[in-house]
A protein has these predicted regions:
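Membrane interfacial helix motifs at helix-loop boundaries and amphipathic/re-entrant anchors
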Residues: 49-79, 114-130, 174-201, 235-253
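Canonical alpha-helical transmembrane segments
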Residues: 81-99, 139-146, 206-215
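Membrane-interfacial loop-to-transmembrane alpha-helix junctions, especially the N-terminal start
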Residues: 34-40, 92-109, 160-163, 219-228
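Alpha-helical transmembrane segments of multi-pass integral membrane proteins
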Residues: 38-50, 106-118, 131-145, 156-181, ...
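Hydrophobic alpha-helical transmembrane segments
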Residues: 20-29, 74-83, 106-113, 147-150, ...
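C-terminal transmembrane-bundle signature of multipass membrane proteins
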Residues: 201-279
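Actinobacteria-biased recognition of intrinsically disordered, low-complexity terminal regions
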Residues: 1-39, 266-279
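Membrane-water interface at the C-terminal end of transmembrane alpha helices
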Residues: 137-159, 256-276
Length: 279
């Protein structure tokens, strides 16, 4: 039996490598792009409005006593967590490219955080807000031509991010309870503007995004979002509120998560067993 020398010298890529190799999808039709544009406007209107408005107020010193909330729950950090997934979904779908593996889990985690927080933290209009978040997200997911399959999304516990996720849950749980109490009992301007609800919302989102990264390798980039937001909350509290042990711990935890996520991103490879790299 003879063997073709050229074929024997050329390695055949494994199924795992082929699955992880980006490939173009069919270009979206005009109708699909109209659906993407309309759903994109709806899903990004609030995070961009609140996020950019809060950023301008923060930079110009408008309402200086609200600077911490402008940075965190009222606008900037919450807006980033809210918009990151939808922006990635829209850009990839518009270009006819596969959506990044982290984009849909990041958006779904934020939507879940919205619904969970609104279910037990009081505040004027918070349940309507959560419904808007969920409905606009569903419209976007309907418009996206090829969402990642749920099968295989959970592929084991990450040995580094899993303990960090548990620590994050233990760190943020009492903070969420405290913010709920403030929203329910205070009658100051912060309570009227539901800032305490916003902070609970942000905290729940950070934890859920970190848990998502801990159980799904393809969604690992959500840990960068969670770590960056946690670091922002901690440092922002130390600089704009007053130094407390909790803010120190939040900054340290967020920095650890961010560092671990970035390091894993740089060293990630396709595992021989068929695991996926973070995308």
């Amino acid at each position: 039996m003879t063997t073709n020398a050229a074929s024997s010298a050329t390695p055949i890529p494994s199924d795992a490598v082929l699955r992880d190799r980006p490939s173009d999808l069919a270009p979206p039709s005009r109708r699909r792009r109209v659906a993407l544009a309309l759903s994109g406007v709806l899903v990004l209107a609030l995070p961009l409005l609140w996020g950019l408005g809060s950023l301008v107020a923060l930079l110009t010193g408008h309402e200086a006593d609200h600077r911490f909330h402008q940075l965190t729950g009222e606008g900037v950090l919450l807006g980033v967590l809210w918009a990151a997934g939808p922006v990635a979904l829209l850009l990839a779908s518009w270009r006819g490219r596969p959506v990044p593996g982290w984009a849909w889990p990041a958006h779904a985690g934020f939507v879940l955080a919205s619904v969970v927080t609104a279910s037990f933290v009081p505040g004027d209009g918070v349940r309507v807000l959560a419904a808007i978040v969920a409905v606009t997200a569903a419209l976007l997911w309907w418009a996206v031509p090829a969402l990642p399959r749920l099968r295989g999304l959970v592929d084991g516990l990450d040995p580094v991010l899993s303990p960090l996720a548990l620590l994050g849950a233990a760190l943020y749980a009492p903070y969420v309870v405290a913010q709920r109490h403030l929203q329910a009992t205070r009658h100051d301007e912060h309570a009227e503007m539901t800032h305490y609800f916003d902070m609970a919302w942000l905290a729940v989102a950070i934890v859920l995004l970190l848990v998502t990264a801990a159980i799904s390798r393809q969604a690992g980039r959500t840990a960068i979002l969670a770590g960056g937001a946690g670091l922002g909350v901690g440092v922002g509290g130390l600089l704009l509120v007053h130094p407390t042990t909790w803010f120190v711990l939040a900054a340290l935890h967020g920095g650890a998560v961010l560092g671990a996520a970035v390091l894993q991103r740089r060293t990630s490879v396709v595992r021989p067993s068929g695991g996926r790299t973070s995308v």
